């Protein structure tokens, strides 16, 4: 399951790269697989989370606290993109928006072992359709 999830995510990164460059600039590059974010340039960090559900299936969508902390600590403009089955949505990450997120322990159990961590749960109404 883990390998399938990685392949699913990498495919979405490749499929959406042109669209992301057209929105955020031609200098955007795709980062290495072990990087904390999926795309960047000198001034911006972009993380893409691909989901297997529609936008409104759940009231929130989650992302690891570590990713958000990394983005905030970078001093760069930081964007999270959520690729739902029915559309691509975005949110710009800044300290003011974090107050609207809920931080709690979460994770998944469907890949053979528990994967638990601290996650921010972002209310979907804060996301903008692209």
What residue ranges belong to the model's regions?
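Acidic-basic catalytic patches of nuclease active cores, encompassing PD-(D/E)XK
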Residues: 1-31
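Surface-exposed cleft-lining segments at the edges of enzyme active sites
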Residues: 2-3, 52-56
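Short glycine/proline-enriched coil/turn segments at helix->beta-strand junctions
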Residues: 22-25, 41-44, 74-77
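Short, charged, amphipathic alpha-helix that recurs within catalytic cores of restriction-modification
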Residues: 57-80
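Nucleic-acid nuclease catalytic cores
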Residues: 72-97
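Intrinsically disordered, low-complexity terminal regions enriched in charged/polar residues
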Residues: 89-130
């Amino acid at each position: 399951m883990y390998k399938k999830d990685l392949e699913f995510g990498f495919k979405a990164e490749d499929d959406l790269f042109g669209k992301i460059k057209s929105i955020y600039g031609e200098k955007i590059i795709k980062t290495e697989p072990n990087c904390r974010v999926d795309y960047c340039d000198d001034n911006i960090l972009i993380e893409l989370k691909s989901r297997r559900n529609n936008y409104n299936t759940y009231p929130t969508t989650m992302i690891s606290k570590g990713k958000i902390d990394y983005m905030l600590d970078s001093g760069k403009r930081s964007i999270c993109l959520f690729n739902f089955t029915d559309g691509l949505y975005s949110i710009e990450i800044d300290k003011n928006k974090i107050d609207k997120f809920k931080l709690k322990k979460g994770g998944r159990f469907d890949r053979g072992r528990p994967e638990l961590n601290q996650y921010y749960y972002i209310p979907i109404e804060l996301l903008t359709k692209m």
